[in-house]
Amino acid sequence: MTTDDESRSVYLGLGTNIGDREANLQEAIERIKGLGLEVVRASSIYETEPVGYHDQPWFLNQVIEANALDWQILSLLKALQNIEREMGRTRTIPNGPRVIDIDILLDDDYVGFFTNTWSAEDNPQIAYASGVILELPHPRLHLRRFVLAPLCEIAPDLMHPQLKKSCSELLAELDDPSIVRIYQSRV
């Protein structure tokens, strides 16, 4: 997490289980860099069993820290969802297969909700009945081994702003038996 006025850390979770999974992660990171975000750190790539909907291929997951000082959070969300769509993401089955998934996990110490102010033309795949399109920190961050393991690798002392526990503490306390293993160590 950053503390100066020259940067703002945003942690992004990436996941893929369709096609060339490694290439999908690499392409997503290159596209994120193409938005002008500086990728500060990237975790190893983890192979993880599906959560929720099990009849699908295993995922590759990774977490990156990016400097998003010049981005409003909803504009960043929209840009990330455009990357997902351009890479072929379709939202058909909740927790189902995907070419790429990019979740905003944390935005420095920000805690709050953002509501939908976009029209259907802006992003027709989003249909949130509650009107809430983004909650920070991610509401299931502390419940998912496939997110916490790579996040702890790059930021073990990062504090969850609501739970007031470090990523390492959250991972140690996690009651999630899902299989998460390093697929490719970071270089």
Q: What does each of the following model-derived ranges do?
A:
Residues 2-12, 18-99, 107-113:
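Nucleotide and nucleotide-moiety/phosphate-recognizing core
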Residues 51-58, 74-78, 82-187:
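Flexible, gly/pro- and Lys/Arg-enriched active-site loops
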